[in-house]
Amino acid sequence: MDTIAITYQKHNKSYPYYGYLRALAKKQHTLLICDDEPDLLELYAAMLSDEYKIIKTASGEECIQRYNEMKDKLENITVILLDFRIGKVTGDKIARDIKEINGAKIILISAYEIDHDLINKLKDEKVIMEFVPKPISLDTLKRIIAKTIWNDGYQ
């Protein structure tokens, strides 16, 4: 097996192989996106499909089902982007159900005002990693997803 050694200078922030490493890492991670608004679901998928494998679901039940299917195939879903209001079910309920299965890195998103105590409780219980209010810019969303992917533990 060949070994590639990559060096960089931390102090002057010179990362000559950054583009190469980014290309190697492209599409290594799978995002499960769950939103019951078809336009938003398609928009998120289109915005993120260049960098990630995307699985789209439009209901809480489908989200849990697809998560289980991928787990059973031993395929890893890296992050779940989960809308808070999905039909009659809330995202915190879905997130708790997924946590009981095997846990996952979940980013909860919502266009609605959500009680800060609930969000803090979900984070403290390690049910979600982040909460993001809608609307959200593409750059901010990508930054939060990247932070979530590379975070090995819950903060």
Language-model features, listed with the residues they occupy:
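Active-site residues of response regulator receiver
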Residues: 82-83
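Non-catalytic signal-transmission and effector/linker regions of two-component phosphorelay proteins
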Residues: 1-30, 38, 137-155
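Acidic, metal-coordinating helix/loop segments flanking the phosphotransfer/catalytic sites
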Residues: 38, 56-79
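Two-component/phosphorelay signaling modules centered on CheY-like receiver
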Residues: 38-56, 125-126
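Hydrophobic/aromatic residues positioned on beta-strands within the core alpha/beta folds
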Residues: 109-111
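Acidic catalytic/metal-coordinating carboxylates
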Residues: 59, 89-93
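Short amphipathic alpha-helix used as the core "switch/output" element in two-component signaling
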Residues: 65, 92-104
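Alpha4 helix (beta4-alpha4-beta5 surface) of REC/receiver domains from two-component response regulators
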Residues: 93, 100, 113-130, 138-139, ...
